[in-house]
């Protein structure tokens, strides 16, 4: 969303071959960029003008910080001499962005190349995240200079010595190993090494919501996702407590509910933590902490350790029982309601459909029910857990992968936060499908309110015609009240040459006992 202070910057980006896309709000622009990032792996570039433009982007930048998304945030600002006497829209933007970024720099014309290279490096190394560059008008207008910066990439490290020997011994001796796989695996070339490691040693695994699909969820060792569902945790956490070896592989507990605090006990269980950054969260502890390359570490652990025969671990077959219990807890055969909506989408849409999910009760249910076949198939805000992200994420994903079916899942409140971007989808000529759970309520908060026996306050609102909104912005719109109507709407949407809003009318309280 440009302003006068970033016009030169926008022009320079286009001339450098970086396509600039106009959104209706800076927050949504950042989430569109994240949707593209999950396709090509490149950092998001978010451009905002000074003052209100920069501040409109605070939410998505905080999300990038907590959800580990590489992002370079370029904000316009007036020059220091000008700011000494000119105050209109002027504030200390670096002070605003510093707490929610990995770094914030004021761009200087004499060091612009160095600072820009630093920004990309910091955003993409270690645990990914946002970096802010405040760009004064005179610096943006200054001619660029070529400077060859010879920067060697960070080396891949692996454990060695006594630590490695101890970890191998635990792996060889474990009768009930369990792996917890988290979002750090997405930023390393981990899929093949992880699969080989888990299969070689017959280790059942749970993923966080963001790591779903790092191995196909129909894999016999996969127990599905974990994060925010007390219902799922009733089955998963006893298995965690019963394990004799916990392997935390790229696991970042920022995605998890408090029930996962100290979910294992290093005093009676062997716990090995392989991670991108040191453990400063104290959500859990381990006997051995390895800040190292995940693929290199898994290879080092396996070297000299004998493979396990199938079913050589967990002689009591408890993981299989847990997997069956989870399938029963989140059934696919409900006639209607939130679970029925998700089940019908699973039955009708292609197996490789790309999904985005807004925060709310529906996201928890979707993350537990949907079986992902590839990494990043289901994208969501699971660290900051912000609303209003699914619709723009889907626009970005469709922009990057126009030949794939792309579907967003939003509650009605979250959809309303981003509904203006329907215009962007129309202007870009994109045809994602926007599924809306319409119950006229902040369903998750209303459920918590009732559980605390508090009066119904500020959680319910009027029902709106979301299908008409889709049509008003040049797309298609369908209002559906059962699985047959939903199936027909999805089928039509997949054949359409423009976007489609599918408004699924469900009853309030439909998530009770479901999440």
Features from the language model and the residues they span:
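Active-site diphosphate/adenylate-binding microenvironment
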Residues: 1, 6-12, 220, 317-392, ...
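Thiamine diphosphate
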Residues: 82-89, 228, 242, 281-282, ...
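Phosphate/pyrophosphate-binding active-site segments
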Residues: 107, 146-148, 165, 169, ...
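Receiver (REC) domain switch-region micro-motif
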Residues: 179, 246, 355, 406, ...
């Amino acid at each position: 969303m440009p302003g006068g202070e970033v016009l030169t910057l926008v022009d320079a980006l286009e001339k450098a071959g970086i396509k600039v896309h106009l959104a209706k709000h800076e927050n949504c622009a950042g989430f569109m960029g994240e949707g593209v990032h999950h396709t090509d792996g490149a950092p998001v570039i978010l451009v905002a003008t000074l003052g209100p433009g920069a501040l409109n982007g605070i939410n998505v930048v905080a999300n990038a910080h907590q959800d580990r998304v590489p992002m370079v945030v370029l904000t316009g600002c007036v020059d220091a001499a000008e700011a000494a006497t000119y105050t209109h829209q002027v504030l200390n933007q670096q002070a605003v962005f510093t707490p929610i970024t990995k770094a914030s720099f004021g761009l200087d014309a004499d060091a612009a190349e160095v600072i820009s290279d630093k920004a990309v490096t910091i955003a993409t190394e270690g645990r990914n995240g946002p970096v802010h560059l405040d760009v004064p008008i005179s610096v943006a207008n200054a001619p660029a200079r070529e400077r060859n910066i010879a920067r060697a990439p960070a080396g891949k490290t692996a454990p060695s010595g006594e630590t490695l020997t101890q970890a191998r011994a635990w792996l060889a001796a474990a009768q009930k190993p369990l792996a917890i796989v988290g979002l750090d695996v997405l930023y390393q070339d981990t899929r093949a090494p992880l699969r080989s490691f888990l299969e070689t040693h017959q280790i059942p695994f749970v993923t966080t919501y963001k790591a779903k699909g790092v191995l196909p969820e129909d894999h016999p060792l996969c127990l599905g996702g974990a994060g925010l569902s007390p219902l799922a945790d009733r089955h998963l956490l006893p298995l965690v407590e019963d394990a004799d070896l916990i392997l935390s592989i790229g696991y970042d507990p920022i995605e998890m509910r408090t029930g996962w605090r100290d979910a294992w006990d290093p005093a009676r269980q062997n716990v090995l933590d392989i991670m991108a950054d040191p453990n400063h969260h104290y959500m859990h502890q381990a006997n051995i902490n390895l800040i190292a390359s995940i693929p290199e570490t898994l290879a080092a652990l396996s070297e000299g350790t004998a493979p396990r025969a199938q079913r050589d671990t967990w002689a009591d077959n408890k993981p299989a029982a847990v997997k069956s219990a989870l399938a029963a807890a989140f059934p696919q055969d409900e006639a209607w309601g939130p679970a029925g909506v998700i089940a019908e989408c699973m039955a009708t849409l292609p197996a490789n459909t790309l999904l985005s999910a807004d925060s709310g009760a529906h996201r928890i249910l979707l993350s537990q029910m949907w079986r992902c076949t590839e990494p990043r198939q289901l994208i969501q805000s699971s660290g900051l857990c912000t609303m209003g992200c699914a619709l723009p994420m889907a626009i970005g994903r469709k922009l990057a992968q126009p030949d794939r079916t792309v579907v967003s899942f939003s509650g009605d409140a979250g959809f309303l936060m981003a509904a203006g971007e329907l215009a962007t989808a129309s202007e870009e000529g994109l045809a994602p499908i926007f599924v809306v759970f319409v119950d006229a309520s902040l369903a998750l908060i209303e459920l918590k309110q009732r559980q605390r026996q508090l009066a119904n306050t500020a959680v319910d609102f009027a029902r709106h015609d979301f299908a008409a909104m889709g049509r008003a912005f040049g797309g298609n719109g369908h209002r559906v009240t059962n699985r047959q109507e939903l199936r027909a709407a999805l089928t039509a949407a997949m054949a359409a040459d423009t976007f489609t809003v599918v408004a699924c009318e469900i009853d309030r309280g439909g998530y009770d006992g479901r999440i």
